[in-house]
Every structure is written in C-alpha cells, then in structure tokens.
C-alpha cells in the first residue's frame, strides 16, 4: 500500500510538472512569437536619420554670411563631438549609463535589476519605478521611435539599439545623444542648453556646469532652475548636481580633490545661471527675411507640390540653407540712414516714431533685391512691413505718372515726348466723362497753370491736369493695361477712375517693392525683372532644392523705355520737383509723388545700376506735417549714395532705333521761322522719338503781327509808321477762364485807334483781350475747348538741347504739381 501511494504521488508530480513545463514551453514559444512579431514590425534602422537632427532653416546674405534663423518653439544648435568637454561626456555616462562602454546597446544586468526592483515596488504599491534605458536606447527613442509607453515600443527600442551599436562607434552614439536630448526650457541638445543656462558655448563649461546639465534629462521640468519651485528651493537641482558629481567620482572620472572642490563651489553659490529671457520671436533682419521665406514657401509649393504643413515642417525642422540676395552691409546702412534722417520732422506716439518710412533697393538687371527696410525706429516682431507687404499698400501719387501716363502714351505711340498740351482747367466735356455728377475737375496745386507745355515739361513739373488730359487721350483701357504690365495692383474701382490712373489716387495702392520693380523697366530696355529675394536653397545633405531663374517680361519697347528714362531727368533737375535725389556725378532719374492731403510721400527712381523706391507716411494715413515729396527725394539720394560708393560713372545706352528731330517746344510740331523768334528766345530743341513718330505738321501756335510798340495793341492804318513793329506771339483761340502763366505772350486783341483784326482772328472778334483779363467773367469757359491742341513751353531738361530756359521770364518759381502738393514743397529744395 505504501509503495502504491508513493507511486501515485510520484506520478502525479510528474504529471503536474509536465503540465507546468508544457505551459511554460507554450508560454515561452508564444512570448517568443510575440516578441518576434514586435521586432518584425519595427521600423527599419536608418543610421542617417539617427545622425540627423531637427534644425531650423538658416538664412544667409549675398556674401554667404549668417543672417537669420527660422523661429521655432525649441532651439537646437548642433555641436561637433570634439567640441564637447570631456567632463560633460563623462557626466552623462556616469548618471545615465555607467556601463555604456561595456554593453552592446542593452544593459542586461541593469535591465534585470530594474525589473526586480519595479516588481517589488508594485507589490509594495509604491509609485517609484526605475528606467533601464541605455544611452543608445534613449537615442533610438529620440530619433527613430515615438514616445509611446508600451511593451511593443520597448522591445523595438532594444532591438534597434543592438542594431545601431553594430553600425556606429560609441563616440558617434554619445555625440548624437548629446545633440538630441531635451534639456529643459527651449533647449534641445547640449549647445543650446549651455547658451540657455550659462550664456556660453558648451566647450567653455566648468565641471559643476557639466554636472548640472547632465542631471537635467531625468526630469527637465523639475530641475529647471528658472521655475518658481527651484527659485524657492535651489536644493532641488543642487542635490541632483551633487549626485552626478558623486557618480563621476564613483566611476573614476574625477578625483577626490575634483569632487571636493566641486561641492565647495556649489555650496559657495558658484553655479550661476544667465538671466532668463523669453524666447525671441523676432528675426534680426525681419524686413527682408520674412518676405524671403514667403518666396521660398511659394516656390516649394509650385515646384514640389508640397502642402502648407510639409513646407512648415521643412523650414522649421529641415535645416535648410537659404541664400538670400540681401547685402547685410547695405541693409544696415540703409536702416541707419532712415532711422536717423533728422529732416523727417520726427515725433513719437505710443512708443513709435513718426512719420514712418520704408525703402527697397534692387538690381533691376537680374532682379536681386539688396535691401528691404519696412520701417524706422524700434518695431515689435512682425510689425507692418511698409516696404514689401501686400497688406500695407498706399496710393502712389504722381510717382505713378511715368508708368500709367507718360510711358504708356509714348509706347502706344499716342503721344511723344514733344506732344503739346495746354495746362489749363479740364474742359467740361472731358470732366463729364468721368463723373456722374458735377464734371471731374482736378486742379493743379496751388492754382497755377503754365499754359502751353509739352509732355516732357509736364512730367518735369508734375502737372496734374496735363496727366489727366493725356490719359483721356490714350484711354483708360490703355492706361490700365500698362499699370498691370508694371505690376501695379488695380482693382475694379481703379479701372473706372481717371484719378487713380493719372494722379495715382489708387483705391488700394502700392508699395516700394512694387515700385522699385516697375521703375527698373526704364533702365532695362523695357524689360520688367521680377524681384528675387534668394538665389538658392540647399537641404542638409547639400542637395540644391531651389535655384530660381530670373523671370522677365516685356513691358515697353526699348525705344519707349529709353525716352521715358531720358524724360525722368526732368523731375530731378533744378526746375523739377526732386533735385535732392541727385548725388555725386551718378546719372539719376526719378519722380516724386504725393497723394491727396499730403498723406503719402514718395520718390521712385533709378540709376544705371539700381532702382529704388522710398515712401514716407503715417500708419493711420493722416497728413504728414512739415515733410514733402522733395524730402522723400532727399532720403532716396542719401540711401543710394551708399549703394554707389566706388562704382564708376555709367550711362543707360540709347537704342540705335531711337531717332532725333528738331521740334518746336510750344506746339510739339516741326519748327517754322517764327519758332526761332519766340519773344522768350528760340523754342526749337532736339527731341528723341520712336522711329515713325516724328511730327509732320508745322508749328501753328506762333503767329506774327504788327503792333503799336508804345501801346502794345495791334497796329492799324491809324498807327504812326514809326510806332509799328513786327513781333511774334502765341495764339489761343478761346478763353480758359483762368489766368495762364504764358498769357503775357499771347497775341493782343485790342486794336490801335480802331480798325479791324487780322483776317485769321476775325472769328474771335467777340473775345477781346480785356475780357480775357477779367477772371470773374467766364461765359466762354467751355467755348471751343482745346483738348489736345499742340502746345509747348520750356524744356530745359532735354539731354540734346538744354538751352532757352523760360523760367527766368516769371518771377514766381512754380511749385511741384503733385496732387494737392503744398507750395512749400519747392521751398524745401535744399
């Protein structure tokens, strides 16, 4: 019986043992299968991914110098392993992975010990759990895997760590770890942490500073020295630092003396942190960098079809190198010039300096923009970019005239530089075309009218009514077409507004970047070159992602471009509106602009090297006091002077197809003998023309008549012969209703002692000279209005014949005629 019982017990034990062994075997096989499945679904190990870190893109200037870095919420500065002090390397190994140089990716001894400790803590219901990740595992987690807490992720982490140890050396792994680890605040990597905490490079860290940084990864928020808890109780991070130092001593990385001195330094409060600062969200060269980044975004979307999220990630984390066209030296000088322009009559309001000013300078030959200044004085981050933003557009005033009026008329061959107009109030039959109510009747400012002028002089003096008459002649549609060719934003309101197209009273407006591109056409044979803000974008591997071509389009014929360029010397002449723009002996061309009520002041122009535009105004669109468009010309000249230092004199070359001819500056027609006998001197000069546009008719404004030289009246049969004198006059067959400055040179209507008028004038017998002088009698104001009667006047700015200046015939020096320009504008030509 006893033996049978023993046999039964033994048999039962074997059965139970076999069952348990079977269970364990099945469980082991199952567990192994699960682990194998987890490993099989692990992502492939990409060593390059491990060694590549998220970095913001960097912008460089046109000389390859560092300029700006794309702003991110976190800062990383990748540092070379050889520049990391040995103390910091040893500190990380001591506190994070003391058997780092012995294991092959996974520390089995530590892993087993941690499991036992964590199981014990669970049984005791303790919340204290320990981690067993090696530095290699942490690197895999930071660069390849997500931060998900799961058995699957842990198994994959261990597997990939073992694989990584086969591919990289220990130094490469440790170096990658120190560049990838989060170290509190905004710091990713040891270099960013060193800058954040101690305002120094990592290579300059002391032993206690190294120990502090190595202690942070365990709990970055707890050991953050700028937190309120740490400020109240510094022992939180000091004790952690001492623990790191002890581990370094225990592992033989520092001596007992080093350890003792380090503790003494900590107790003596020698662990000093830099003053905390909020992360800046302002770029160093914000005016230029933001438009450049926007252009890169646009091109990435066009070329690679990336969506906005992909583009954002690439710029923020992709470590791109963006080589811009900005010249840092000239950008700094231009900013300084605008900030310190004492003649801007500056004042402060709500901490901001006013008036504000902006400028753009570009090489119109290749489109490279060299300077963008979006404002003056201290500005908050992402402030108005008054130079380049399409959200900050302002009316251009008369600076639009060369674009939508004069070059448009010449290029379309509907007028020439010599075409004559009468500077006099707009006739009602024209005014009614552009107004449903009272006739449109813009005025010169102040109320001065020159009488007969040609197109060249009208541009020089910026005469408003002539610009309106010329747009009426070429048609709104033609003017609109050229505005769009030049890149001027035109909306539906502008399309039906002659004020927008002839006087620059645009509904939305323009900005200096738009105007600098447009004015470059005149020096570039009529070719518009699109602004280019960068030349190349390279990814972190050195591959060129973007290399934009120079985009151009034809706007004007070379002939029309050159003739307009030549005409633009008028506004910067002493008789023009902006002579202050001149500097040195450089060839300068340009045009002032003033919008209504002196709210926006402009100067746009070019040299044979660069085109540039300057704007002055207030952000609230209020009147700018004590500053004029001539001030904008002065600022333009001061800026451009710096751009042309050591550049040789140069000229824009005249196309061979541009022809010249002698014409009468009063009528714009071929001269007669009377043209040489104008009472103010010869009105014959040599003008540029597009071939085929030289006038064929002869001057009909000058007339000759015999007068009584004593009374100035027309001679008659009653006039004594010794008082009869033959003189040359100007004819005007109607009364303009206002006094014109050339009125004193008109053919007299009064007859000496009775008699009859010359036969050609009999039709105007009712219009006597005395009636013309009476400003209060305007019965004949709209009788026979002369819309496009060929006229002319002084043209001292023509490059081929600058004689016969008529300015000396009047004591009153005429002011600029920008829309509502204050008469004081001309008093400020300093």
UniProtKB/Swiss-Prot annotation:
Residues 57-229 are annotated as: Transglycosylase. The keyword Chloroplast does not apply. The chain crosses the membrane at residues 19-39. It is found in: Cell membrane. Residues 40-830 are extracellular. GO terms for cellular component: plasma membrane. Pathway: Cell wall biogenesis; peptidoglycan biosynthesis. Residues 760-786, 821-830 have a biased composition (Basic and acidic residues). Residues 357-641 are annotated as: Transpeptidase. GO terms for molecular function: penicillin binding; peptidoglycan glycosyltransferase activity; serine-type D-Ala-D-Ala carboxypeptidase activity. Keywords: Antibiotic resistance, Carboxypeptidase, Cell membrane, Cell shape, Cell wall biogenesis/degradation, Glycosyltransferase, Hydrolase, Membrane, Multifunctional enzyme, Peptidoglycan synthesis, Protease, Signal-anchor, Transferase, Transmembrane, Transmembrane helix. It catalyses: [GlcNAc-(1->4)-Mur2Ac(oyl-L-Ala-gamma-D-Glu-L-Lys-D-Ala-D-Ala)](n)-di-trans,octa-cis-undecaprenyl diphosphate + beta-D-GlcNAc-(1->4)-Mur2Ac(oyl-L-Ala-gamma-D-Glu-L-Lys-D-Ala-D-Ala)-di-trans,octa-cis-undecaprenyl diphosphate = [GlcNAc-(1->4)-Mur2Ac(oyl-L-Ala-gamma-D-Glu-L-Lys-D-Ala-D-Ala)](n+1)-di-trans,octa-cis-undecaprenyl diphosphate + di-trans,octa-cis-undecaprenyl diphosphate + H(+); Preferential cleavage: (Ac)2-L-Lys-D-Ala-|-D-Ala. Also transpeptidation of peptidyl-alanyl moieties that are N-acyl substituents of D-alanine. GO terms for biological process: cell wall organization; peptidoglycan biosynthetic process; proteolysis; regulation of cell shape; response to antibiotic. It is a single-pass type II membrane protein. Signal peptide: none annotated. The active site is at 96 (proton donor), 398 (acyl-ester intermediate). Pfam families: Transgly, Transpeptidase. Its EC number is 2.4.99.28, 3.4.16.4. Residues 787-820 have a biased composition (Low complexity). Its main location: membrane. Residues 1-18 are cytoplasmic. In the N-terminal section; belongs to the glycosyltransferase 51 family. Cell wall formation. Synthesis of cross-linked peptidoglycan from the lipid intermediates. The enzyme has a penicillin-insensitive transglycosylase N-terminal domain (formation of linear glycan strands) and a penicillin-sensitive transpeptidase C-terminal domain (cross-linking of the peptide subunits). This is Penicillin-binding protein 1A. It comes from Clostridium botulinum (strain Hall / ATCC 3502 / NCTC 13319 / Type A).
């Amino acid at each position: 019986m006893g033996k049978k019982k023993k046999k039964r017990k033994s048999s039962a034990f074997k059965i139970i043992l076999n069952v348990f062994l079977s269970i364990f075997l099945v469980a082991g096989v199952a567990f192994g299968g699960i682990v194998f499945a987890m490993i099989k679904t692990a992502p492939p190990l990409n060593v390059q991914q491990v060694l590549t870190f998220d970095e913001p893109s960097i912008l460089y200037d046109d000389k390859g110098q560092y300029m700006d870095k794309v702003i991110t919420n976190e800062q990383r500065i990748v540092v070379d392993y050889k520049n990391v002090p040995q103390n910091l390397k040893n500190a990380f190994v001591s506190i994070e992975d003391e058997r780092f140089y012995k294991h092959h990716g996974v520390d089995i001894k530590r892993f087993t010990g941690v499991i036992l400790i964590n199981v014990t803590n669970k049984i005791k219901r303790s919340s204290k759990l320990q981690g067993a990740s090696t530095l290699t595992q942490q690197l895999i987690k930071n660069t390849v895997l997500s931060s998900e807490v799961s058995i699957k992720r842990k198994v994959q982490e261990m597997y990939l760590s073992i694989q990584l140890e086969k591919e990289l050396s220990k130094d490469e792994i440790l170096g990658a770890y120190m560049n990838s680890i989060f170290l509190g605040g905004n710091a990713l990597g040891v270099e960013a942490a060193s800058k954040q905490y101690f305002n120094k490079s990592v290579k300059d860290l002391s032993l206690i500073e190294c120990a502090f940084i190595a202690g942070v990864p365990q709990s970055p928020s707890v050991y953050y020295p700028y937190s309120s808890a740490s400020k109240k109780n510094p022992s939180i991070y000091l004790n952690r630092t001492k623990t790191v130092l002890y581990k370094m001593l225990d592992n033989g990385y520092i001596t007992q003396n080093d350890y003792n001195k380090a503790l003494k330094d900590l107790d003596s409060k020698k662990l000093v942190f830099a003053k905390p600062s909020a992360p800046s969200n302002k770029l160093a060269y914000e005016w230029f960098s933001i438009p450049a980044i926007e252009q890169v975004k646009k091109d990435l979307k066009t070329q690679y079809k990336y969506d906005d999220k992909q583009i954002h990630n690439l710029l923020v984390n992709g470590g791109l190198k963006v080589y811009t066209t900005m010249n840092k030296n000239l950008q700094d000088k231009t900013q300084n010039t605008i900030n310190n322009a004492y003649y801007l009559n500056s004042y402060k309001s709500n901490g901001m300096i006013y008036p504000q000013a902006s400028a753009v300078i570009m090489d119109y030959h290749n489109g490279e923009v060299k300077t963008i200044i979006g404002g003056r004085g201290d500005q908050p981050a992402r402030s108005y970019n008054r130079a380049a933003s399409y959200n900050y557009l302002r009316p251009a005033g008369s600076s639009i005239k060369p674009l939508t009026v004069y070059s448009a008329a010449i290029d379309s061959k509907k007028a020439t530089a010599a075409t004559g107009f009468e500077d006099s109030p707009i006739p009602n039959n024209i005014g009614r075309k552009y107004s449903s109510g009272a006739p449109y009747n813009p005025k010169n400012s102040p109320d001065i009218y020159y009488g007969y002028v040609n197109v060249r002089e009208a541009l020089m003096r910026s005469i408003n009514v002539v610009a309106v008459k010329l747009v009426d002649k070429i048609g709104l549609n033609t003017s609109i077409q050229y505005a769009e060719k030049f890149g001027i934003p035109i909306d539906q309101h502008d399309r039906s507004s002659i004020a927008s197209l002839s006087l620059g009273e645009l509904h939305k407006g323009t900005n200096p970047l738009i105007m600098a591109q447009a004015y470059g056409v005149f020096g570039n044979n009529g070719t518009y070159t699109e602004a280019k803000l960068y030349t190349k974008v390279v990814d972190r591997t050195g591959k060129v992602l973007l290399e934009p071509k120079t985009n151009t389009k034809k706007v004007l014929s070379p002939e029309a471009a050159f003739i307009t360029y030549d005409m633009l010397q008028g506004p910067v002449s002493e008789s023009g509106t902006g002579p202050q723009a001149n500097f040195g002996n450089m060839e300068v061309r340009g045009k002032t602009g003033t919008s209504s009520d002196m709210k926006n002041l402009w100067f746009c122009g070019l040299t044979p090297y660069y085109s540039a535009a300057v704007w002055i105004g207030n952000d609230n669109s209020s009147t700018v006091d004590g500053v004029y468009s001539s001030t904008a010309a002065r600022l333009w000249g001061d800026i451009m002077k710096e751009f042309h230092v050591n550049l040789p004199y140069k000229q824009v070359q005249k196309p061979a197809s541009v022809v010249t001819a002698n014409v009468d500056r009063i009528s714009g027609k071929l001269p007669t003998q009377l043209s040489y006998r104008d009472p103010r001197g010869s009105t014959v000069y040599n003008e540029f023309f597009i071939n085929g546009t030289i006038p064929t008719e002869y001057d009909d404004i000058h007339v000759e008549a015999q007068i009584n030289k004593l009374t100035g009246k027309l001679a008659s049969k009653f006039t004594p012969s010794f008082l009869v004198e033959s003189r040359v006059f100007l004819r005007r067959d109607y009364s303009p209703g206002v006094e014109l400055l050339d009125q004193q040179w008109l053919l007299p209507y009064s007859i000496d002692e009775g008699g009859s008028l010359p036969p050609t004038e009999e039709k105007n017998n009712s219009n006597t000279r005395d009636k013309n002088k009476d400003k209060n009698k305007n019965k004949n104001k709209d009788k026979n209005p002369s819309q496009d009667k060929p006229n002319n006047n002084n043209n001292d700015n023509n490059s081929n014949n600058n004689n016969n200046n008529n300015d000396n015939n009047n004591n009153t020096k005429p002011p600029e005629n920008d829309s509502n320009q204050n008469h004081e504008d001309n008093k400020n030509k300093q």
